[in-house]
Amino acid sequence: MIKANWTSTSAFNLELALDESRDWIERVINQKFPSDFQSSLRDGIFLCKLINQIQPNSVPKYNQSPSTDFAKRENIQLFIKSAKHSMGLRDTQLFESQDLFESIRIRNIAITLYWLGRAARASQTYKGPQLDLLKFQGMNCSACKKAITNNDYLTTMTQQFHTSCAVCCSCSCKLDPKKKFYQESNNFWCENCMLGATNLGGSNNSSGGKNKSNNNNNNKCSGCFGSLEKGYVPDENDKEKKYCTSCICDLCHDPLIGNFQVKDGKKVCDSCSCKSCGKSLEDGYYEEGISKYCEPCAKDRNKPKQVMDKDGHDHHHHNHNKPTTTTTTTNSNSPLAKKKSDSCKMCDKPVDNKTKKYGDDRDKYCTPHEKDGTCGKCNGELVGSAISVMDKNFHPQCFKCDSCNKNLNQNDQIKKSPTTGNPLCGPCSSNNNKSSKNCHDCKKPISGSSVEALDRPYHPNCLKCYSCSKNLKEDFTEVDNEPFCNPCASQLNQYTSGNQKQPKQGGSPFITSGWLDSDRCVVCVKPLNGEVAKIFDSFYHKGCFKCTDKSCNAPLLTGYFPHDKKPYCQKCSIKIQQSTTTDHCAKCSKPIIEGSILKVAGKVYHKSCYDNEKHTSSSSSSSSVNCFKCKSQITGTQFVRLDQKDYCMKCSPSASSSTTVTHGERLNYGMTVDPRSGKRVFNTSK
């Protein structure tokens, strides 16, 4: 407990924050500002360049030479919109365009750059220069954690508060800026509530020799033994221990920014505390945007949650080639672990609709949480501590090399197995260990020279284009983790990007959105990303979209033929129809799967075969065939069969003579297939 006064000097130095912002932006975009910092930002160009460096293509198009005020404001709006949607910043963390363009409320610009810098630190992909958050110390209210956007605030030596947030914790009265108050951590007491308190401040008023001898120790930080002139925070359990604001957080090891807590001798920063209740997040947390919540608070919010490990605060400082220890929340004593048997043990979503194909603990979780709740090695449920590495979690006893079964340590250099995705130790993943490698293509051991592509070993003659099987001796292009020669990759991009001429009906089966997080590729059962082919209710990665016939397995880059809701190439489709049809031409004995059919004297013919054969004039037997369209009985000798359906001559669609097979274009059946819906539309024009 300390007796304190309000100060007239803000704990936040705006000039220092703006100087750090300018230096950070120049280091990120590798370009110096030509003039005054604020004036250089007015056209929005530097801001758009900044966010594109942090999150590539966040602002794909902006005016790089704006000549009008409207164009400049539009660039600023593009930056604000991208910071909100791409980086997860909230409206309260963003400045308005007039704040920058009219040079008002400059403090709000610093607030936005501060939160953008924090979001960049949390990004898993951004590896560039980082913003020094210490230069923004005291920017937010230490009580409500919200930004102070005006001059209506009160400050202490190390903290500042909205005037409305500076209230007595006992009587809830607003603290008078002209009077002294009493403070302990984030709690304040007015003088009236502290009247009559026993020995309050007695140690400060006493002049005993003992207190005098300990004066030097009382003025030093218990953590770094530095000076406490700029303020301190007392330990909640040991009032004699004091910690300065320069100490680092004991959980994330980042410098302490603004307010922090001390519990059980551990210093915890705001980022390692629950956004709602302030509780330490050392046992794990739930993340929502860039805010973090403890388990009870996250459950009360009833929003989609994802369990993160306790070190998730600064994963950007970690070496991602090394595993990290995490603590799961699937312990049976946890409130969230006591679920119904038909609900996911992590998010309460029903798992009834999920295919129970594993027969182990993975069936206890919904598809998005299978990896979070189960071991990547034994598929057993994770209880207590676990090791998180390569997008998987492992029991400590299961964290072994996938090849030699050697126990792995957290400091070991490991590599991801290209087949199972599990970790490999250094010797097993080394390129020098030739005898332990098999060619990824032919599966035979590699004893001589080898080449490596996409983290997989090949014989020199086995590295071929995934599409045309051309031997790849020079550069190649990766598409969905498969090698393609440059011509095939260019052709693939033409079909999927819309550069290829498309028919009027139908369209490409490749889509870039529209699936759920629980949807998986039906071939590799991996999460969907990038361009995906949708056939009826099934999804395929672009590299997995091949003919269903295993003996063929041809990539379906230029079209497909559906059978039983599965895609086939043209050759395999014809084979299927030939094997299923019951009608064979009486002359050539070949199956009749398309074109015009003649039925004479109980026999069926291809029209071309019947026309080329001389027949005696005889009356034909009555036909028992019904038209598929009008349902009437076909009385003549000639009818048309398309896609194993019979039509009278009046209702028959035109047979197609085209043999081109592209997505949605006319097939040799005389119809158009919409790959997204599977709807078939007969072509009426030749």
UniProtKB/Swiss-Prot annotation:
Disulfide bonds: none annotated. The keyword Repeat applies. SUPFAM superfamilies: Calponin-homology domain, CH-domain (SSF47576), Glucocorticoid receptor-like (DNA-binding domain) (SSF57716). Induction: Repressed by limF. PANTHER family: ZYX102 PROTEIN. GO terms for cellular component: cell cortex; cortical cytoskeleton; cytosol; phagocytic cup; phagocytic vesicle. SMART domains: CH (SM00033), LIM (SM00132). Residues 322-333 have a biased composition (Low complexity). Involved in the regulation of phagocytosis. May repress rab21. It comes from Dictyostelium discoideum (Social amoeba). Interacts with limF and rab21. The keyword Transport does not apply. This is Calponin homology and LIM domain-containing protein. Residues 15-120 form the Calponin-homology (CH) domain. Residues 305-345 are annotated as: Disordered. InterPro entries: CH_dom (IPR001715), CH_dom_sf (IPR036872), SM22_calponin (IPR003096), Znf_LIM (IPR001781). Residues 305-314 have a biased composition (Basic and acidic residues). It comes from the Eukaryota. The gene is ChLim. One of its GO terms (biological process) is filopodium assembly.
